[in-house]
Amino acid sequence: MGQKVHPIGMRIGVIRDWDSKWYAEKDYADFLHEDLRIRDYVAKRLSDASVSRVEIERAANRVNITIHTAKPGMVIGKGGSEVEALRKNLNELTQKRVHINIVEIKRADLDAKLVAENIARQLEGRVSFRRAQKQAIQRTMRAGAKGIKTQVSGRLGGADIARAEHYSEGTVPLHTLRADIDYAWEEADTTYGKLGVKVWIYRGEVLPTKKNNVEGGK
């Protein structure tokens, strides 16, 4: 059976950049596990803040963390109290000086991670998987996407046999490297077990296409 490559991993170095930016030789494994601990902690502490991405940069004994969120006010807190508490806890976790940047996501409906989270939370609230997917597709297309594909898999509707159902609208050119495709997955904990949610969003081309030379032109 044919398998799909990760859409973001395939585009790194072409139109996408790494989420972790640092170089290490002997400490590579330690830094990698530290990155995982940072991401897990941020995801749990800011689970209601619509966090899409966490970028990590390292320089000497300093760690710069950039949090992309649709609700910056919830991350920052009143008078910056929440982000300051987050910084102190990350200082203790890493034993390094941590600097936190907050980047607001202007259009949450064009972010695959946030769309997948929204579908998963609806599934946990016993909303029909068909309705949750179709509503998400409508919102994303209205927000200006060129195409979207969603998939929900597991014991759909409490069925004994797990299956997958997907819906799509527009185009999602996975083989076109210049196509800006955002991909994410999320899990929904239901009374019948876990459901997997996958979302692909095509937001248009990034690199300008070369103009075709007119035959016989100057």
UniProtKB/Swiss-Prot annotation:
Residues covered by the KH type-2 domain: 38-106
Keyword Ribonucleoprotein listed: yes
GO biological process: translation
InterPro entries assigned to the protein according to its UniProt record, in alphabetical order: KH_dom (IPR004087), KH_dom-like_a/b (IPR015946), KH_dom_type_2 (IPR004044), KH_sf_prok-type (IPR009019), Ribosomal_S3_C_sf (IPR036419), Ribosomal_uS3_bac-typ (IPR005704), Ribosomal_uS3_C (IPR001351), Ribosomal_uS3_CS (IPR018280)
Stored CDD domains: KH-II_30S_S3
Gene Ontology cellular-component terms listed: cytosolic small ribosomal subunit
Keyword RNA-binding in annotation: yes
SMART domains in alphabetical order: KH (SM00322)
Domain of life: Bacteria
Sorted UniProt keywords: Ribonucleoprotein, Ribosomal protein, RNA-binding, rRNA-binding
Disulfide bonds: none
A single GO molecular function term of this UniProt record: mRNA binding
PROSITE patterns: KH_TYPE_2 (PS50823), RIBOSOMAL_S3 (PS00548)
SUBUNIT field: Part of the 30S ribosomal subunit. Forms a tight complex with proteins S10 and S14.
Function: Binds the lower part of the 30S subunit head. Binds mRNA in the 70S ribosome, positioning it for translation.
Family from the record: Belongs to the universal ribosomal protein uS3 family.
Protein name in the entry: Small ribosomal subunit protein uS3
Origin species: Listeria monocytogenes serovar 1/2a (strain ATCC BAA-679 / EGD-e)
